[in-house]
Amino acid sequence: MVRYSASPALETKCAKARGAYLRTHFKNSREVAFTINGMSLKKAFIFLDNVKEHKQAVPFRRFNGGVGRTAQGKEFGVTQARWPVKSVKFFYDLLKNAEANAEAKGLDMDKLIIKHVQVNAAPKQRRRTYRAHGRVTAYLSSPSHIEIIVAEEEEAVPKANDTVSRVSLKQGAKARNLAARKAITAA
């Protein structure tokens, strides 16, 4: 059994999926994860499909140096956004896996929400490129470890109406005096 970095409140009401050493850029994956965290599963699938078709963009908030601006970032309140299709494909596959795990557990598909997404940087894979004058330069890739936990949305418990109102000493004295005056004038 693999250890996840977060533990859900109810293990029976959640499903998990994870991928290790995935050949997709860590920085792009982090931005996709931050965007889909908290979405419902259906909404996340629609969003990821739209990113693949360049209808919606993933906002780049942390790793945004040199990232171009696009009007599609306005819905998230940013100007810098991109369409990291390869990272989106990995997230789509992991969400499909989590959905299948939830279905196997008998969870309600319409109530599933992405409760936890985490992306960690995997060890860099090394290659080399040959340069002029006999030099060699490192050619590194930045793979990712991704873990996702989806859970059924908890139903909101209605707040009790039986609230005891706290009255200060001064407010209580005023109320008693007012009641006494009403009693005197009524008599």
From Swiss-Prot:
One of its GO terms (cellular component) is cytosolic large ribosomal subunit. Signal peptide: none annotated. Its main location: cytoplasm. CDD domains: Ribosomal_L22. Keywords: Cytoplasm, Ribonucleoprotein, Ribosomal protein. GO terms for biological process: cytoplasmic translation. InterPro entries: Ribosomal_uL22, Ribosomal_uL22_CS, Ribosomal_uL22_euk/arc, Ribosomal_uL22_sf. It holds the Pfam family Ribosomal_L22. There are 2 genes for uL22 in S.pombe. Component of the large ribosomal subunit (LSU). Mature yeast ribosomes consist of a small (40S) and a large (60S) subunit. The 40S small subunit contains 1 molecule of ribosomal RNA (18S rRNA) and at least 33 different proteins. The large 60S subunit contains 3 rRNA molecules (25S, 5.8S and 5S rRNA) and at least 46 different proteins. uL22 is associated with the polypeptide exit tunnel. This is Large ribosomal subunit protein uL22A. It comes from Schizosaccharomyces pombe (strain 972 / ATCC 24843).
